[in-house]
């Protein structure tokens, strides 16, 4: 074999390896925008069950009290009581937005960047703590309501 044929073989072999390697890479991850996060935050708020006195949930987003301190520390590096969370709608929205942003990014990955599937999974997690829990009943109805509001709120492409 001469030098030219060896070089040609190496070039073809190298091209084949690069092609196979590129095919094995996952599709480019779609970046979740602030507008999408805001749309989901608003959808979760609008879809939340009506607040009733002493229902054990706090704010317009109906957050369980055991999440509030943990989420506040994660998002703001400050502790917050459920009563403080309830009393300060701006701070509550900021914390919810922080958590929902991470949640939506995770669900985008889990749904192969499918927008509505990611939103459905996020809504399920928000209500139950399990992204796949909205198969039927009240949780499925809630997830559908979140999707409907999200579609109205999200930025048009």
What are these model-derived regions, one by one?
Residues 33-37, 53-57, 61, 85-93, ...:
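Solvent-exposed, acidic/flexible segments
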Residues 18-27:
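C-terminal segment of classical bacterial N-terminal signal peptides
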Residues 2-14:
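Bacterial N-terminal signal peptides that target proteins for export
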Residues 74-120, 128-131:
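Alpha-helical segment that forms one wall of the substrate-binding/catalytic cleft
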Residues 117-157:
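Catalytic and substrate-binding regions of cell-wall glycan-acting enzymes that process beta-1,4-linked
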Residues 56-78, 124-126:
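Substrate-binding/active-site groove segments that recognize
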Residues 32-52, 63, 96, 120-130:
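Short, functionally critical alpha-helical segments immediately adjacent to catalytic or ligand/cofactor-binding
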Residues 45-53, 69, 73, 97-108, ...:
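Sec-exported extracytoplasmic/periplasmic mature domains
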